[in-house]
Swiss-Prot record:
It comes from Vibrio atlanticus (strain LGP32) (Vibrio splendidus (strain Mel32)). Pfam families: MatP, MatP_C. Belongs to the MatP family. This is Macrodomain Ter protein. It is found in: Cytoplasm. The gene is matP.
């Protein structure tokens, strides 16, 4: 699925991605000389609010090894951004203990589905089981009434 590209927004994401990688200690520039790399990074840091400048910096200074990773990160961010606009595509998060997640993951693998589908399946099964239990209880009550009325 294609998502609309919003240049200013995505430039901000690119700037954040590059600064994050730099802070993590990764080499984000194509420069071998550390002084050139430092100058390029300082120039990048000054471009926070200049989207077109970020694109220019990327074409002039970014490490080629980082190009594919940056594109993937921006594609994922774009998808999350547009999916967050609609309730049915927005991702929700829940906290699970590791052992619970592990059991859920195993069940999802057995069913051959996603974790979300497995949760949905388990909830519907629990609902069906509860309904069947109520039906059995009602039948027992009706049967005991019939038997007690006969005497």
């Amino acid at each position: 699925m294609k998502y609309q590209q919003l240049e200013n927004l995505e430039c901000g994401w690119k700037w954040n991605y590059l600064v994050k990688k730099w802070k993590e200690g990764e080499s984000i520039t194509c420069h071998i000389d550390s002084s050139e790399a430092d100058v390029a990074v300082q120039a990048l840091l000054k471009l926070e609010h200049q989207p077109t400048g970020v694109l220019e910096w990327i074409s002039d200074n970014m490490s080629p090894e980082l190009d594919n990773k940056l594109k993937q990160a921006i594609r994922a961010k774009r998808k999350r951004h547009f999916n967050a606009e609609q309730v049915h595509t927005k991702k929700k998060s829940i906290d699970l203990d590791y052992r619970v997640w592990e059991k859920l993951s195993q069940r999802a693998n057995e069913l051959g589905c996603t974790l979300s589908d497995a949760i949905e399946y388990l909830v519907s099964e629990a609902s069906r089981s509860e309904q069947a239990s109520k039906t059995v209880t009602n039948l027992k009550e009706d049967l005991s009434k019939l038997l007690s009325d006969d005497k």
